[in-house]
């Protein structure tokens, strides 16, 4: 028998005035996976997540979390999820232990159980030495780890992570990635929104690409890369080379649209087979297009995103009124 999906959403719509921030998005997240939602700022990622987390009403469409209807039974859904975002929602005047104890109490745990959960999470997230320090003394990475720990106080089976590594340095981002992988190993399901292509590539088993409120592609990282070609020819055009002629040659020989950076003269060409690279280079030579370097690599998610949307993932999409980051513990938690 097929297991109930962790998230099953169809035709999600959210409108703010004249802006259709989420425009008919479908999402299907399997139990036990990391599912990535990738898109630029303002694409609608956070708005979609907030609807799934019961933080925003759904204007049209439907969604279920482990089979529970998000609109009809929001209280039950909140018992199944944890949520954390790019802005830590912990109280700076309290210590790490006090913050976690408070979240446990808000979730209905008895005082002793909340304290035990706090100690367990401090150990799990390597924060024991800082347990009695006020949060004001924490680094950004420590705050983010504590915020994630708070979302796990009642061991929810589904975690929503809204751009959890935004603003972190590379080392701390790597540590957060390890923590997220550990959550899945321990049995959690993770829905991760991100604008970082490498983050989606590193973590997610499957990815939905969101642009201007719509889902424009979905698949595993390898499937998405294969959709724009099996290989990428990377060419550095020599200074003074005719860039327009080079693009025409690529279109004629490879039947593909090159991605050119005019300022640097760097051109990426998606290829259906690596053998096609030789044909393109011969065409350049016969036409007098000079190059200084060349390589053939697997396509990147950046090239996938550009091919699908016509712009990079670091570009701003339409304004997303809910896209200022999720810091949702206070809203999701209910005093019981």
Label each region the model flagged.
Residues 1-13, 311-336:
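ABC-family P-loop ATPase nucleotide-binding domain
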Residues 4-9, 14-211, 216-217:
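ABC transporter nucleotide-binding domains
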Residues 14, 27, 235-237, 269, ...:
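Preference for bulky hydrophobic residues occupying beta-strand positions
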Residues 177-271:
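ABC transporter nucleotide-binding domain
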Residues 258-261, 290-297:
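Conserved short beta-strand edge segments in small beta-sheet-based binding/regulatory domains
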């Amino acid at each position: 028998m097929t297991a109930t999906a962790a998230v099953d959403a169809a035709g999600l719509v959210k409108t703010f005035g004249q802006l259709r921030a989420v425009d008919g998005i479908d999402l299907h997240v399997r139990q036990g996976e990391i599912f990535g939602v990738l898109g630029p700022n303002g694409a609608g990622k956070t708005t979609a997540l907030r609807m799934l987390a019961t933080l925003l009403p759904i204007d049209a469409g439907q969604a279920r979390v482990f089979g529970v209807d998000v609109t009809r039974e929001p209280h039950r859904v909140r018992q199944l999820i944890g949520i954390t975002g790019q802005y830590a929602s912990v109280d700076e005047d309290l210590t790490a232990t006090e913050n976690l104890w408070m979240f446990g109490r808000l979730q209905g745990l008895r005082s002793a159980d909340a304290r035990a959960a706090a100690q367990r999470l401090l150990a799990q997230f390597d924060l024991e030495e800082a347990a009695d320090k006020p949060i004001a003394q924490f680094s950004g990475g420590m705050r983010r780890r504590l915020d994630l720990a708070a979302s796990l106080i009642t061991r929810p089976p589904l975690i929503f992570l809204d751009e959890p590594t935004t603003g972190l340095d590379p080392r701390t981002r790597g540590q957060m990635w390890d923590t997220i992988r550990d959550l899945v190993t321990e049995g959690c399901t993770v829905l991760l929104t991100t604008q970082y292509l490498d983050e989606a590539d590193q973590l997610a088993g499957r990815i939905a690409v969101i642009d201007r409120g719509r889902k424009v592609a979905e698949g595993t990282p390898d499937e998405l890369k294969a959709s724009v070609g099996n290989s990428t020819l990377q060419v550095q055009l020599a200074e003074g080379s005719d860039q327009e002629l080079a693009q025409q040659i690529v279109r004629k020989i490879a039947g593909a649209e090159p991605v050119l950076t005019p300022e640097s003269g760097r051109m990426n060409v998606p290829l259906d087979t690596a053998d096609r690279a030789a044909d393109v280079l011969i065409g350049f030579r016969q036409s007098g297009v000079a190059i200084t370097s060349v390589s053939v690599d697997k396509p990147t998610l950046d090239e996938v995103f550009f091919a699908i949307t016509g712009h990079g993932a670091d570009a701003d999409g339409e304004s997303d009124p809910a896209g200022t980051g999720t810091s949702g513990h206070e809203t999701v938690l209910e005093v019981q």
